[in-house]
C-alpha cells in the first residue's frame, strides 16, 4: 500500500513538473519573406484591457487612438467612431511583417506609439494579440496599449454608436 502511495505521489510530482514547464514564456514567432529580407521576431506580449464604458467615456479624448484591427471589409461595414483600421488578418495567419506594416500605416506618425492606444478586434483575443505584439516591435509604450474587453462584439451589444 505504501509503495502504491509513494508511486502515485511520484507520478503526481512528475506530471505537475511537466505542466509547469509549459507555463513559461510564450515561444517566439519568427516570420521571413524569404530571400535576403530580415526575419521579424515577434514575442507574445501580455495584454491590458479597457471596458466598453471606459472607452465610450474617452472616445472624444484626443489622447486616445482607437485602432480597429479587424479585417478591412469588417471595418468598412461598421466601426467605432473615429477608429482607424490596422488589419491584422495576415499577422493572425503568421505573416508578422504584413501585420507590422499595416500597424505602421495605421499609426501614420511614429510618435503615436506613445499615446494611449485602444485595440478593437472581434472579441478581444487573437487579432488584438497580434496587434499588441506588433506595437511592441514598433517600440510602443505598452503601459498605454489597451484591448477593448469583448471586442467589437461587446461594443455592439452595449448599443454604442457605430459609423460606416
Protein language model features and the residues they cover:
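Rhodanese-like catalytic fold shared by cysteine-dependent sulfurtransferases
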Residues: 2-10, 15-61, 75-118, 122-164
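Short hydrophobic beta-strand that contains or immediately precedes a catalytic carboxylate
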Residues: 65-70, 86
Amino acid at each position: 500500500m505504501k509503495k502504491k502511495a509513494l508511486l502515485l505521489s511520484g507520478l503526481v510530482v512528475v506530471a505537475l513538473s511537466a505542466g509547469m514547464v509549459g507555463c513559461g514564456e510564450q515561444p517566439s514567432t519568427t516570420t521571413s519573406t524569404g530571400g535576403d529580407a530580415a526575419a521579424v521576431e515577434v514575442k507574445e506580449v501580455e495584454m491590458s484591457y479597457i471596458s466598453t464604458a471606459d472607452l465610450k467615456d474617452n472616445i472624444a479624448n484626443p489622447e486616445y487612438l482607437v485602432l480597429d484591427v479587424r479585417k478591412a471589409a469588417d471595418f468598412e461595414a461598421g466601426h467605432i467612431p473615429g477608429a482607424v483600421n490596422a488589419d491584422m488578418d495576415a499577422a493572425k495567419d503568421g505573416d508578422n511583417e504584413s501585420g507590422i506594416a499595416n500597424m505602421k500605416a495605421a499609426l501614420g506618425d511614429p510618435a503615436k506609439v506613445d499615446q494611449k492606444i485602444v485595440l478593437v478586434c472581434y472579441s478581444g483575443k487573437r487579432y488584438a494579440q497580434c496587434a499588441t505584439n506588433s506595437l511592441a516591435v514598433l517600440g510602443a509604450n505598452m503601459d498605454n496599449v489597451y484591448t477593448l474587453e469583448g471586442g467589437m462584439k461587446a461594443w455592439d451589444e452595449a448599443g454604442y454608436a457605430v459609423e460606416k
